[in-house]
């Protein structure tokens, strides 16, 4: 930490956790081993930990403690304080708590259980999403001050700005493939190389996040219904008139109908391919307020035209099952299956919706790249998303699209294609 005294505070937290919680493991990591543990050096982290423990009243010190290089074992309860450095950071097994010397800029977006939050706006009450797709508690927020920054660009267009010492656990694919933990400034010097054939290749690939386990939410309509309405639905006149679905695909229509609430009727317009969603007529006749129209309003897509559509937050941050059903509704209507392994495409004239669908795919452990097709005739531009999902998820319900779609079995990764000083 760059703050005076923060290492001492971290030492106190580490001792408190391991002293009062049997079997816990607390880790410390830094770029050089001597910064973590160097015999007799007051600047090293482990010297401070030992000095802190030695200054405590005897009842707060372990009765039986073993001290070795980069390791302090509390033999009374089996807890451990361990140290790691350089490429070995993150390789020492699981930790209950880990302190690392790294930083992102304050304007970086961090995914939490409630959506994206700027790094500078994070609080101790936020829960951030880890690479395993689960929520993680924030144990401390520290202002690292001013430092030189690097801009890291990935093959899907994602850009991250971070400090030179920010740690990355990546797959190095040159020679024998291996997983390494490196700092930004180390990758900067060697992230690309030239093949014997003269082709520029990229050394580092980043594993994708596991499907995110957001909590299931109470939703006004089934996610598949919402996805299909966003794709082929008419909602621009809701609540003045009823929503409708337009499709020539009978399989889609049948599946859509099966996911409608019991209070909703689904009637085909005369000699057409559109279907109106109305309330089932009950004792109150048609004088009561339309529940299906209100449901569309509650979802948040009422009154939206094609280029204004988006995915409401409640659906975007619901459970894995709900997000997959939503994506399937979108893909069955406005998506296509690619013939190459595990690829699919989604088309929309809404930039906001394109960004939301991209997030949806990535939140399921997938990968998405976006291209913009400019329209020379004066119409709106089209955003095309190329999507790859993990093997356990199928982006379609429709059989005719699934018959074309081929499951991708190999690992999905993003390459680091550019690192620049900013």
Predicted features and spans:
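Short conserved micro-motifs at the rims of enzyme active sites and ligand-binding pockets
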Residues: 93-96, 163-164, 396-397
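Short strand-coil-strand connectors
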Residues: 75-77, 113-115, 131-133, 155-156
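Active-site beta-strand termini and strand-to-loop segments that position acidic
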Residues: 72-76, 277-280, 387
């Amino acid at each position: 930490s760059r703050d005076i005294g923060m290492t001492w505070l971290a030492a106190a937290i580490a001792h408190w956790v391991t002293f009062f919680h049997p079997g816990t493991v607390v880790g410390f990591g830094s770029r050089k081993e001597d910064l973590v543990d160097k015999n007799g050096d007051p600047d090293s982290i482990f010297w401070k930990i030992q000095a802190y423990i030695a200054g405590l009243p005897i009842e707060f010190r372990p009765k039986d403690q073993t001290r070795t290089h980069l390791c302090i074992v509390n033999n009374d309860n089996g807890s451990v304080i361990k140290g790691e450095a350089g490429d070995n950071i993150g390789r020492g097994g699981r930790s209950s708590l880990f302190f690392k010397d790294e930083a992102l800029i304050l304007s970086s977006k961090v995914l939490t259980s409630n959506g994206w939050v700027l790094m500078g706006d994070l609080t101790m009450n936020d829960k951030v999403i880890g690479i395993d797709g689960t929520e993680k508690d924030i144990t401390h927020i520290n202002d690292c001050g001013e430092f030189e920054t690097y801009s890291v660009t990935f093959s899907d267009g994602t850009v991250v700005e971070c400090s030179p010492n920010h740690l990355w656990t990546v797959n190095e694919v040159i020679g024998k493939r291996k997983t390494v933990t490196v700092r930004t400034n180390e990758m900067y010097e060697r992230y690309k190389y030239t093949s014997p054939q003269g082709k520029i290749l990229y050394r580092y690939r980043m594993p994708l996040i596991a499907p995110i386990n957001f909590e299931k939410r109470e939703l006004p309509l089934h996610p598949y219904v919402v996805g299909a309405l966003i794709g082929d639905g008419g909602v621009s006149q809701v609540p003045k008139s009823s929503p409708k679905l337009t499709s020539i695909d009978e399989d889609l229509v049948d599946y859509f109908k099966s996911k409608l609430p019991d209070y909703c009727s689904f009637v085909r317009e005369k000699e057409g391919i559109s279907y109106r969603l109305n309330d089932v007529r009950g004792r109150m006749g048609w004088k009561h307020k339309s529940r299906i129209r209100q449901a569309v309003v509650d979802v948040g897509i009422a009154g939206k035209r094609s280029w204004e559509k988006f995915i409401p937050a409640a659906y975007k941050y619901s459970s894995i099952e709900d997000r997959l059903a939503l994506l399937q509704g979108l893909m069955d209507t406005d998506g296509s299956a690619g013939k190459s392994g595990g690829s699919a495409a989604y088309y929309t004239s809404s930039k906001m919706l394109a960004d939301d669908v991209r997030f949806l795919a990535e939140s399921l452990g997938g990968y998405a790249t976006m291209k913009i097709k400019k329209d020379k005739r004066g119409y709106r531009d089209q955003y095309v998303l190329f999507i790859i999902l993990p093997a356990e998820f199928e982006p379609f319900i429709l059989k005719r699209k699934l018959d074309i779609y081929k499951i991708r079995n190999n690992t999905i990764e993003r390459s680091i294609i550019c690192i620049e000083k900013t």
